[in-house]
């Protein structure tokens, strides 16, 4: 047995499923998950000594690559002064100044510890500010594991939400309306049925939890217009897209102004950080200035703030996003060329530094139904064959891939060459 197999066997006796987050267990692709010993730049190194070109990037945060010296040094320096104080620090102020400068729609920001905390708190704030209970989310979009968001669509577009996890009471889910991503008609229908009851829409501007599905040109502007028409807040969940699709996020890339923005992943530089913020009048409703409660023992802790501050300063340097786009575009085009040579039907979506691979005969993938029609079994085989080639992709057909500026063009070309060999055998 390999070291990974031995560790996984031991882990399953101690951790549910042997992991601390479900997708890591390889249940979406089968087999034994890799246990990682270290990472550097664009590479992961497992406990058995094998190196992999990494396109998971810790599920998004590692836009600069692993073990970046600026972030590492910032964490070490901060740790020498203390790990957490439970009191305000100068770095919190500097971090807030930087975030609001980089994302101009955020007049104010509240730091939290995860993307789930950010979305959960933003929704509570929207409900408190508007005095309304219902929210709209989209089928196939994921916004963390808060109860009101673990909801699937009912039997029709306008049915009340149903829990999609045991432990979520139906009374929680009934206030969540699930519409079809990239389908404005379904959203308008929800507003027409509940014109005075919807507090907010929450949306991934690029859906990254049904692989990678960009918005149609009219979709995000249409959501903004509907929110304005019905007095509803628009929450853009940039946990995945923030600082990756563009420096000011997908909202800037697509030219849409939200009322609230949720951030995570890159904002922490690899440390557990989330944030939400937006319009000053809305944020003023948050405790202690307003009645909507939110708190956290480690929110804004000095280690996470130091890591995030160092990361964002590097990400804001000229050329970073041009490099991400160039590398991701080359990878997408190369994969399509290699698939075509082998007669393998493939769609590759990509925006900025994120991409999605779909095995499908369809010409495009634009919504959850398109994603569900893809060949998951073929993806599973592709994943394991690429792993054997030393390429680490997301171990699920429903998760986006992530590029970093640490990837070289040689890494990209080697990945394409590996895919060419794999497509020939699929």
UniProtKB/Swiss-Prot annotation:
Q: Which residues form a coiled coil?
A: none
Q: Name one GO molecular function term.
A: glutamate-1-semialdehyde 2,1-aminomutase activity
> What cofactor does this protein call for?
pyridoxal 5'-phosphate
Q: Which PANTHER family match?
A: GLUTAMATE-1-SEMIALDEHYDE 2,1-AMINOMUTASE (PTHR43713), GLUTAMATE-1-SEMIALDEHYDE 2,1-AMINOMUTASE 1, CHLOROPLASTIC-RELATED (PTHR43713:SF3)
Q: Which UniProt keywords apply?
A: Cytoplasm, Isomerase, Porphyrin biosynthesis, Pyridoxal phosphate
Instruction: Supply the source organism for this entry.
Output: Shigella boydii serotype 18 (strain CDC 3083-94 / BS512)
Question: Under which name does UniProt file this protein?
Answer: Glutamate-1-semialdehyde 2,1-aminomutase
**Keyword Isomerase recorded:** yes
Q: Which residues carry this modification: N6-(pyridoxal phosphate)lysine?
A: 265
Kindly give the InterPro entries that the UniProt entry links to this protein: 4pyrrol_synth_GluAld_NH2Trfase (IPR004639), Aminotrans_3 (IPR005814), Aminotrans_3_PPA_site (IPR049704), PyrdxlP-dep_Trfase (IPR015424), PyrdxlP-dep_Trfase_major (IPR015421), PyrdxlP-dep_Trfase_small (IPR015422)
EC number(s) on file = 5.4.3.8
Which GO biological-process labels does this protein carry? protoporphyrinogen IX biosynthetic process
List the CDD domains hit by this protein, alphabetically. OAT_like
């Amino acid at each position: 047995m390999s070291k990974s197999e031995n560790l996984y066997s031991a882990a399953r006796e101690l951790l549910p499923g042997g992991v601390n987050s479900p997708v890591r267990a390889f249940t979406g692709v089968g087999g034994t998950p890799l246990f990682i010993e270290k990472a550097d730049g664009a590479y992961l190194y497992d406990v058995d000594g094998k190196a992999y070109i990494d396109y998971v990037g810790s599920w998004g945060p590692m836009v600069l690559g692993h073990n970046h010296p600026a972030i590492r040094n910032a964490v070490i320096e901060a740790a020498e002064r203390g790990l957490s104080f439970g009191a305000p620090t100068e770095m919190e102020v500097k971090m807030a100044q930087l975030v609001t400068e980089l994302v101009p729609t955020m007049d104010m920001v509240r730091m939290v510890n995860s993307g789930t905390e950010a979305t959960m708190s933003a929704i509570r704030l929207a409900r408190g500010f508007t005095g309304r209970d219902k929210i709209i989310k989209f089928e196939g979009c994921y916004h963390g594991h808060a109860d009101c968001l673990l909801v699937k669509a009912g039997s029709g577009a306008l049915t009340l939400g149903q829990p999609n996890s045991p432990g979520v009471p139906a009374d929680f889910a009934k206030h969540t309306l699930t519409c079809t991503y990239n389908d404005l008609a379904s959203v308008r229908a929800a507003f027409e049925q509940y014109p005075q009851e919807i507090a907010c829409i929450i949306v991934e501007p690029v859906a990254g939890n049904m692989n990678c599905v960009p918005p149609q040109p009219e979709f995000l502007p249409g959501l903004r217009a509907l929110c304005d028409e019905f007095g509803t807040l628009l929450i853009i969940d940039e946990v995945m897209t923030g600082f990756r699709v563009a420096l000011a996020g997908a909202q800037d890339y697509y030219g849409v102004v939200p009322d609230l923005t949720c951030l995570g992943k890159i904002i922490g530089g690899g440390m557990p950080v989330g944030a939400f913020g937006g319009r000053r009048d809305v944020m003023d409703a948050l405790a202690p200035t307003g009645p909507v409660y939110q708190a956290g023992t480690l929110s804004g802790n000095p280690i996470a703030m130091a890591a995030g501050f160092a990361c964002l300063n590097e990400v804001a340097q000229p050329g970073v996003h041009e490099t991400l786009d160039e590398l991701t575009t080359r990878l997408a085009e190369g994969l399509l060329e290699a698939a075509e040579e082998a007669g393998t039907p493939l769609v590759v979506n990509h925006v900025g530094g994120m991409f999605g691979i779909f095995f499908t005969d369809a010409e495009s993938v634009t919504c959850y139904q398109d994603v569900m029609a893809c060949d998951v079994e073929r993806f599973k085989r592709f994943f394991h064959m690429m792993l054997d080639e030393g390429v680490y992709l997301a171990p699920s057909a429903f998760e986006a891939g992530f590029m970093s500026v640490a990837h070289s063009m040689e890494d990209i070309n080697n990945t394409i060459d590996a895919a060419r060999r794999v497509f020939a055998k699929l």
